[in-house]
């Protein structure tokens, strides 16, 4: 029988028993499906052309809080406590230091909640616990604090193009703030979005901003707002296939079997490598399901439009969190990270990597580990990830240019690097799945720490070769997972900047109510 352990509603316990899934997971999926229907209703009946921004904020917030309390019970109060105290900090600390104070508090509050959940209540269990939504809220709080600091304290010439475009030039009202952090579209699974993108969506400006940002032509504004139906349908199909794969195949290929004593003693190296790859491949569909469904919910509400491609097809990937085909066909560590958990990668870039004064790669991986939680396996994964990232960068910079031509040689290079990338990624993230330190070291011992040793040798033996310098040295220093987003962010920044005066010129008594917010 499925477990009845949950802090939220037990109304769906009969359904949980029928499908043999834990009640917390059933609550999560049902609430997300409800959010999908609510999103369609929200776009149809509460469209920005039919009602005020105030009503849209209120409804989005109340629905979000209802879903939170249904899933997590009184633990959902943590969402309001974290958000509320952070808002007060923004007001009290002021624009000069709010970003630092909010960063320390929000991340600290999240860590305390994670420690309490992990070491007191639920060690070693994957569950739809309340700290999951808090991770997204933490991203939003910290992002907004930095965006307000950039927009209201720093000079424009001190900002990068993306920071300038995302900068918030006035303090949000309490309603806008809570709507941003706790709206029904993103309260359970995100994804992260910038405050300016969210406000533009609520106020009905998102479509115009995205269209004008395509090529700057005024006539683009005359286009009707595109329908998200095709994009939502496609994403729901991906969700269905991912869920089917997870329920039927994933349980047959447990990652834990990689540390089974009999398997370790009898399996050949090719067998070990093959099972390592397929077991981690089978572990990914649950993320594909959750993130793609969250993206579909936002799209169904009308949020996520990013303009048109060169063929005139509407793109609904403004806040997409992954690109499955690119992930599975990755031929480098860089390419994998570019396409996995995209919005979190953007958050890490914006609040840490771009602002770090030393060792930005190490600081970024460390922040990522803290944000994910307190399991030792997370830290082991991210420490290994630093080593693998630096080694992969060194190999790429030293050898890739030898395999560009002819096409046959490049194909051979792509096949080899695909296999190496998939094994390296799998090797790196095993502790992330196993969670505990002893099983993680058991796995690495069974592989004789071979990839750790190879990476260290690569860093010691290969000469340091940097990529060709760009005009902006700060851009040149960006991590692999960050560079891909520059063009997109710059474009969005220009779009947002073009709307800046409209935002700043809102009436004073609306502006006086504004205070603080996040990503």
Swiss-Prot record:
Recount the known activity regulation: Partially inhibited by thimerosal.
Which EC number(s) does UniProt give?
Answer: 2.3.1.-, 2.3.1.51, 2.3.1.23, 2.3.1.n7
| UniProt superkingdom | Eukaryota
Q: How does it sit in the membrane?
A: Multi-pass membrane protein
Associated pathway: Lipid metabolism; phospholipid metabolism
A Pfam family per the record: MBOAT
Reaction(s) the record says it catalyses: a 1-acyl-sn-glycero-3-phosphocholine + an acyl-CoA = a 1,2-diacyl-sn-glycero-3-phosphocholine + CoA; a 1-acyl-sn-glycero-3-phosphoethanolamine + an acyl-CoA = a 1,2-diacyl-sn-glycero-3-phosphoethanolamine + CoA; a 1-acyl-sn-glycero-3-phosphate + an acyl-CoA = a 1,2-diacyl-sn-glycero-3-phosphate + CoA; (9Z)-hexadecenoyl-CoA + 1-hexadecanoyl-sn-glycero-3-phosphocholine = 1-hexadecanoyl-2-(9Z-hexadecenoyl)-sn-glycero-3-phosphocholine + CoA
Cellular component, GO, one term: membrane
Its function, per the record, reads:
Acyltransferase which catalyzes the transfer of an acyl group from an acyl-CoA to a lysophospholipid leading to the production of a phospholipid and participates in the reacylation step of the phospholipid remodeling pathway also known as the Lands cycle. May catalyze preferentially the acylation of lysophosphatidylethanolamine (1-acyl-sn-glycero-3-phosphoethanolamine or LPE) and lysophosphatidic acid (LPA) and to a lesser extend lysophosphatidylcholine (LPC) and lysophosphatidylserine (LPS). Prefers oleoyl-CoA as the acyl donor. May be involved in chondrocyte differentiation.
What name does the UniProt record give this protein? Membrane-bound glycerophospholipid O-acyltransferase 2
Lineage at the top is: Eukaryota, Metazoa, Chordata, Craniata, Vertebrata
């Amino acid at each position: 029988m499925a477990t009845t352990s949950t802090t939220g509603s037990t109304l769906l316990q009969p359904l949980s028993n029928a499908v043999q899934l834990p009640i917390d997971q059933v609550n999560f999926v049902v609430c997300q499906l409800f959010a999908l229907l609510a999103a369609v209703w929200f776009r149809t009946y509460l469209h920005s052309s039919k009602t005020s921004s105030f009503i849209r904020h209120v409804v989005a917030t109340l629905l979000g809080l209802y879903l939170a309390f249904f899933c997590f019970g009184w633990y959902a109060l943590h969402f309001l406590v974290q958000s509320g105290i952070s808002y007060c900090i923004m007001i009290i600390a002021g624009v000069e230091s709010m970003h630092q104070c909010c960063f320390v508090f929000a991340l600290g509050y999240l860590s305390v909640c994670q420690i309490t959940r992990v070491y007191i209540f639920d060690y070693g269990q994957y569950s739809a616990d309340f700290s999951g939504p808090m991770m997204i809220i933490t991203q939003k709080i910290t992002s907004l604090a930095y965006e307000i600091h950039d927009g209201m304290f720093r000079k424009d010439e001190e900002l990068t193009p993306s920071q300038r475009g995302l900068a918030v030039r006035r303090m949000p009202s309490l309603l806008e703030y809570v709507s941003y952090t706790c709206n029904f579209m993103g309260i359970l699974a995100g994804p992260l979005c910038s405050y300016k993108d969210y406000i533009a969506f609520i106020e009905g400006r998102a479509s115009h901003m995205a269209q004008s940002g395509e090529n700057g032509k005024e006539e683009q504004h005359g286009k009707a707002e595109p329908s998200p139906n095709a994009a939502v349908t496609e994403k729901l199909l991906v969700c269905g296939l991912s869920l089917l794969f997870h329920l039927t195949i994933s349980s047959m290929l447990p990652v834990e079997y990689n540390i089974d004593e009999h398997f370790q003693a009898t399996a050949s190296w090719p067998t070990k490598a093959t099972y390592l790859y397929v077991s981690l491949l089978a572990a990914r569909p649950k993320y594909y399901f959750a993130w793609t469904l969250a993206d579909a919910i936002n799209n169904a509400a009308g949020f996520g439009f990013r303009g048109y491609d060169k063929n005139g097809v509407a793109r609904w990937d403004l806040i997409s969190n992954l690109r499955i085909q690119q992930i599975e066909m990755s031929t480098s560590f860089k390419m994998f990270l570019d396409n996995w958990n995209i919005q979190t990668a953007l958050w890490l870039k914006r609040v840490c990597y771009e602002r770090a004064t030393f060792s930005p790669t190490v600081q970024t991986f460390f922040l990522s580990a803290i944000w994910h939680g307190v399991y030792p396996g997370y830290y082991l994964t991210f420490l290994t990830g630093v080593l693998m990232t630096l080694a992969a960068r060194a190999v790429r910079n030293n050898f890739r240019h030898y395999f560009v031509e002819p096409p046959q040689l490049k194909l051979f290079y792509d096949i080899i690097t695909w296999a190496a990338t998939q094994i390296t990624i799998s090797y790196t993230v095993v502790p992330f799945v196993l969670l505990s330190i002893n099983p993680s070291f058991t796995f690495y011992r069974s592989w004789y720490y071979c990839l750790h040793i190879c990476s260290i040798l690569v860093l010691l033996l290969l000469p340091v070769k940097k990529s060709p310098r760009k005009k902006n040295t700060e851009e040149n220093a960006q991590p692999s997972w960050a560079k891909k987003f520059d063009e997109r962010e710059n474009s969005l920044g220009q779009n947002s900047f073009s709307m800046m005066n409209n935002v700043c010129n809102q009436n004073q008594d609306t502006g006086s109510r504004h205070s603080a917010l996040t990503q």
